[in-house]
Amino acid sequence: MLFNINEKGEPLVISFAPFLSPEAIKYLQENERCSDQSQKRTAQQIEAIYTSGQNILVSASAGSGKTFVMVERILDKILRGVSIDRLFISTFTVKAATELRERIENKLYSQIAQTTDFQMKVYLTEQLQSLCQADIGTMDAFAQKVVSRYGYSIGISSQFRIMQDKAEQDVLKQEVFSKLFSEFMNQKEAPVFRALVKNFSGNCKDTSAFRELVYTCYSFSQSTENPKIWLQENFLSAAKTYQRLEDIPDHDIELLLLAMQDTANQLRDVTDMEDYGQLTKAGSRSAKYTKHLTIIEKLSDWVRDFKCLYGKAGLDRLIRDVTGLIPSGNDVTVSKVKYPVFKTLHQKLKQFRHLETILMYQKDCFPLLEQLQDFVLAFSEAYLAVKIQESAFEFSDIAHFAIKILEENTDIRQSYQQHYHEVMVDEYQDNNHMQERLLTLLSNGHNRFMVGDIKQSIYRFRQADPQIFNQKFRDYQKKPEQGKVILLKENFRSQSEVLNVSNAVFSHLMDESVGDVLYDEQHQLIAGSHAQTVPYLDRRAQLLLYNSDKDDGNAPSDSEGISFSEVTIVAKEIIKLHNDKGVPFEDITLLVSSRTRNDIISHTFNQYGIPIVTDGGQQNYLKSVEVMVMLDTLRTINNPRNDYALVALLRSPMFAFDEDDLARIALQKDNELDKDCLYDKIQRAVIGRGAHPELIHDTLLGKLNVFLKTLKSWRRYAKLGSLYDLIWKIFNDRFYFDFVASQAKAEQAQANLYALALRANQFEKSGYKGLYRFIKMIDKVLETQNDLADVEVAAPKQAVNLMTIHKSKGLQFPYVFILNCDKRFSMTDIHKSFILNRQHGIGIKYLADIKGLLGETTLNSVKVSMETLPYQLNKQELRLATLSEQMRLLYVAMTRAEKKVYFIGKASKSKSQEITDPKKLGKLLPLALREQLLTFQDWLLAIADIFSTEDLYFDVRFIEDSDLTQESVGRLQTPQLLNPDDLKDNRQSETIARALDMLEAVSQLNANYEAAIHLPTVRTPSQLKATYEPLLEPIGVDIIEKSSRSLSDFTLPHFSKKAKVEASHIGSALHQLMQVLPLSKPINQQTLLDALRGIDSNEEVKTALDLKKIESFFCDTSLGQFFQTYQKHLYREAPFAILKLDPISQEEYVLRGIIDAYFLFDDHIVLVDYKTDKYKQPIELKKRYQQQLELYAEALTQTYKLPVTKRYLVLMGGGKPEIVEV
């Protein structure tokens, strides 16, 4: 029940409906099932919307309508009396929060319109007004609100800012690291610290590898709920725990024993094959068979009796026995077919090899790890202190501050817990432990609503942990009193062809070992409507592989990205879709695993005329040519004796010195000085005191004087003005901003330059003043191999989309191409010198000196890199986590498609047909095989091979070179359409285009039918005007350039938001002005301004008129002076109407129009027409309008019976007025 006050001050009581009971929800589900609605809510959606009073975890598969469920649940809460500001709603991105807010807003508007209860209308209107203040946003945004409000309780000022620029963070980190490094190098334990640095960097001078280690440890700790406690208690957890063979986890030993038993079973299967050859010709056992039987028996015995024969303490002995027992190779060959029986076991043995030696030396690295722990802790504290001093923090800092505030202040925490009716989280699978801790503190323990899908957890690089979702899922299923699990399986996005192939692939691929969830019936995708189940045979998924048999090893490696042949396959399919199916380009999306090395896609698509839009690439802002030129200009202003920057500035388009000029300047050195900078040589060259003054000719001397004068003015201005103004002064003084507009990618270049000025302004506003500090900051960014964010420019809408799989999450597209399926998964992290794990802490490769094991030797030391036991433990977990995330990436990519999905890759056809496993084990690919395969393509081919008897809903097709010729690929059949923006520079263009279309249609009909039917003898003036006047209006037509102009426009902020003035409006205003202009007065700016006030146009159009050009016409041209001299003979904007004979029907028709100006004399007429078209050469417009002026002349001759002796076009669309006689 809610009380409001009406306009008379009287209380209004609103009675809200109670929350639904489980029985009421079941009743609602049954009603929905029996209803005749075309789109029904599923039983699970209804349950997720209306269940209340407990924690709820919604596992929502791709396309299952999770956003719909969230919006409906929020609306239901509001309608039952829960104010919107009492809901905490967390989203993964700002964009998602905006979209969710808009959906709620639309729902509230709709609800207000539907309700007839005045009191409810008032209440809903209040909710609408409160929506903008509601806690709907990212966890980062909420944490900022908490710290801004309660930061004082932990000593944090509310006037802080967020350091979003990674470059700024790295600059501060570098300063802190350098200072701390020097302190540790001079401390009491310096020898241990030096050994630590050498273990990772090789020597103490190059600290880059050690610095990366420290930064990574720091960043990893920041994703935990309490970084300091994690560093103190968990950082060395594995190093303290795993020091003996007995400490090896049981799970790892079980995997080894499982590999041994699997090897024995596979070997037995191979020996039972008919062609194996168990017996010799004499009937006795073959030597091969005897050897293999021994292996089978011993492996089985050792597995069965492991605890008795070996145990954990004898694990190293088991490894030696197995290594000596099995052959060194992986394969057993039967009838020329190779079976990789021993491959998995060899990989497991490698993991445990040299364990005894490793454990002997592992204890020596513990003091190094303690030093590392101390350094990272000290670095974390020092870095935070610097940020507190600057009052500038990272998002993780703010989140930890918020956690600290809520943990240490019971009253604040309880106020939030009492305030929030429910704590709702979207994309819960992508939460990290820091965010989970914050959510726990906000909740009262039984009011959490979490929506996500563990199969779409793909942000491990942001320290997202899918196990948070997984643990909740298990806990709620085992203990329903803790919470309820609701599964949304119905997919409302994709056709059955996409759903079936997704289910087929992941039911054979994903389980808890690899993928973190068993893809069983409760996780499989189900079509949400009957329309999705209608079959389309041409939409069956395709695995298209370029056959690399003929490459002879010359094909690009996986690291080199997608090949030209693969892109050509994609282009061929797109052309087929576009030509044969009429699929618009914007319905097609290409998904890639990373943004790098995709230039070949754009290049190839350009060759075939396929428009493409990318979501960006690597950050290369500071490496763009125009920005590098400006930075070198600023460096020169700051220090002219910087030769590198000075040469770059001289060679730039701003001053255009060539190699010959620079060589002449370089020879003007002072013989008395050993070293002489270029700036000094320029100064000597100007005053003629260089070593060879005769080389400085007059032209070069003039250029040098201009340069020195300009540089001097810039240096003077740099001391007085702001950076922003200095940059714009450079642009204006040397017209550099205008210059780049004439170059390739003009929009991008100008956007980059504009952004440089804005960033300089932002830099100074953040408290850093001066050119020197700005240059230093930029140089530090470059030193740390960082860059600033690229400036985006607007892209065409009708184009194929190219984006990363990560960027596509949450989106959907009719046709999806998953490219580069043969690219190996990045396993860089598992080969680093250290690996971090939340539970185990750090594991490192230790550079041990094993000189003692070698006996007598003359070597001072023998260093060997060893994988310590914690490192091996973390490595195995990281490998499985990486494979699991790649599997989920494939799931995300496939489920983006609405109609059809394509997989594109390359492979050797002959090798891919080799048998990879002797038999399938159950429904899943064998675990060992899934761990070995390192590409999407390998997974798909293995499934196609091992489960070939099933319908997997995708076809494998090899593409040969003969399929990729120009003739085979084909060409787009799309006609080249004129850009409508190129037709707006004058009044006539749009109507001309419309009239030409009409006339073309009429012409075609006249060719097929009797012309008289379509051209009546008598027509009204209004009818004739609609048909013919557009062709004859005195307004120019655009000259369309051979290449269409780009419509891209960067979206940087600008100060003017004036409406765009169309060129056609300017053309109309010019004609009106020429009609009313009093020619009896001297034509000057004042006369033109007075006349301008009398025309019917808005102020923007009047301002856009070039009055100087009009003045120039009357004052500087003979025709303009002719106007003033013979103004009594002048007629302006004169309408006419004449009869014309149709050449086909031989019928007469009326031709009407308006003539801009003509002079009527006793014996002749002079005709004048104004044109505002843009043009390159006047001859173009002369040819275009010759026939039009002939019609005007004919009309005048018929009317006055006098010849038209002169016909002039007045061209006002160029830089100055031009007169063309026609």
Curated annotation (Swiss-Prot):
Residues 39-495 form the UvrD-like helicase ATP-binding domain. GO terms for biological process: double-strand break repair via homologous recombination. Coiled coil: none annotated. It comes from the Bacteria. ATP binds at residues 60-67. The keyword ATP-binding applies. Signal peptide: none annotated. It catalyses: Couples ATP hydrolysis with the unwinding of duplex DNA by translocating in the 3'-5' direction; ATP + H2O = ADP + phosphate + H(+). Residues 524-810 form the UvrD-like helicase C-terminal domain. GO terms for molecular function: 3'-5' DNA helicase activity; 3'-5' exonuclease activity; ATP binding; ATP hydrolysis activity; double-stranded DNA binding. Pfam families: PDDEXK_1, UvrD-helicase, UvrD_C. CDD domains: DEXQc_UvrD. Gene3D superfamilies: 3.90.320.10, P-loop containing nucleotide triphosphate hydrolases, PCRA, domain 4. One of its GO terms (cellular component) is cytosol. Keywords: ATP-binding, DNA damage, DNA repair, DNA-binding, Exonuclease, Helicase, Hydrolase, Isomerase, Nuclease, Nucleotide-binding. Its EC number is 3.1.-.-, 5.6.2.4. Belongs to the helicase family. AddA subfamily. The heterodimer acts as both an ATP-dependent DNA helicase and an ATP-dependent, dual-direction single-stranded exonuclease. Recognizes the chi site generating a DNA molecule suitable for the initiation of homologous recombination. The AddA nuclease domain is required for chi fragment generation; this subunit has the helicase and 3' -> 5' nuclease activities. This is ATP-dependent helicase/nuclease subunit A. It comes from Streptococcus pyogenes serotype M6 (strain ATCC BAA-946 / MGAS10394).
